[in-house]
Amino acid sequence: MMRRTLYPEIEPYETGFLEVDEPHHLYWEQSGNPDGVPVVFLHGGPGAGAVPAHRRFFDPRHYRIVIFDQRGAGRSTPLGDLTRNTTADLVADTEKLRTHLGIDRWFVFGGSWGSSLALAYGEAHPDRCRALILRGIFLCRKDEIDWFMTGMRRLFPEAWSEFANYLPAEERGDLLHNYHRRLIDPNPEVHLPAARAWSRYEGSCSTLRPNPDAVTSFLEPATALGLARIEAHYFVNDCFMPEGALLENVGRLEGVPGVIVQGRYDAVCPVVSAVELAEVWRGARLQIVTDAGHSAMEPGIRSELIATMERFKSIDDT
C-alpha cells in the first residue's frame, strides 16, 4: 500500500548559509539520504519561510531533501529585507544553491508562491528539473492578487472585515498600498501590528475547516513580518513579471513531468488557476482534492503530495 502519511521528524545532516547579493545570506539545509535523489522544497509566501515539518513529505531513505529560506524569509538574513528581492533574484538563488551543493538535477516541490517560483525556475532551467510537484497554484496575475486582497471576503467575510478594518476608513479603498506603506515602515510599532493583521487574514483563509493552530503559526513575529512585508512587496510590483508570463512560457517545460495538487475549495489560490495551467502544460497531471482548501497540511492535500513523491521513487531517471 502506498504511503500517504507524513514521515517521522528528522534533523538535517548539514546546514549552512549561502551568500548571494548583499545584504542577503540564505539559510539552507539538507536532510534524509546524502546519496539519495535530490528534491528541493520551495516555500510559499513569498516570505513565509520553511519549517521542520516540510522535511516530512519525503522518504528520508530515498530522497536528499534540500530546503532553504528565500531572501528575507525565515532563518535567512536580514529578515524582511527587500533589497534586490525579486522573482528573478530568487530563481538565480535557487540555481546557485543547486550548483553550490553539487546537484545535477533535482525534483522541484513548491506550493502557493512556491508553485510560482517552481514554475519560474523550471521555465528558466528545465534541464535541471526531474519533475515539478506543485500545490495551490498561483500564477502571479493581477486578478489573483485582487482576489487575495478583496475577493476572499466572499468566502471569509469575517476574516476580511478584520483585515480591512485594521486600516482607517479612509484607507480601505486601497488595501494593498496602504498595508504596504505600513509594512515597509522601519518602526516596529508600525510594521509589526500590520504584519500580524495581514498574516492572520491569510492564515484564517487557508484551511477548509477552522484551524486555530494554523492561524497562530502565522502570527509569530518573524513569520508575520517576513510573510506580510515580502508578500506586499511582490504584490505591489506585480510579482516582478509581465502579466501572464508563467502561463505563456509553459512551453519551455516541454519534456518536464509535472503533478499539480489542488484543493477544490482553495480560497487563497482558487482552483481555476490550476485548471488553466494543466490545460497548457502537456506534461502535467492535475489532481483536484475534493475536500480541501489551500494549506499543504490539509489532510487530503498532504496525502496526495506524499503519494506523489512515493510514485516518483519508482522512476529510474538519472
Task: Tell what function each PLM region has.
Residues L253-E254, I260-Q262:
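Short beta-strand/loop motif that positions the catalytic acidic residue
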Residues D127-Y179:
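A catalytic-pocket lid/entrance helix-loop region that shapes and gates access to the active site
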Residues A284-T318:
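Catalytic active-site module of serine/aspartate enzymes centered on a nucleophile-bearing elbow/loop
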Residues R4-L26, E231:
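N-terminal cap/lid segment of alpha/beta-hydrolase-fold proteins
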Residues E19-P78:
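Conserved HGGG/HGGXW glycine-rich cap/lid loop of the alpha/beta-hydrolase fold
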Residues D104-D143:
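Conserved hydrolase catalytic core segment
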Residues A88-W106:
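Conserved acidic catalytic loop of the alpha/beta-hydrolase fold
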Residues P242, A267-S273:
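Conserved alpha/beta-hydrolase "acid-adjacent" motif
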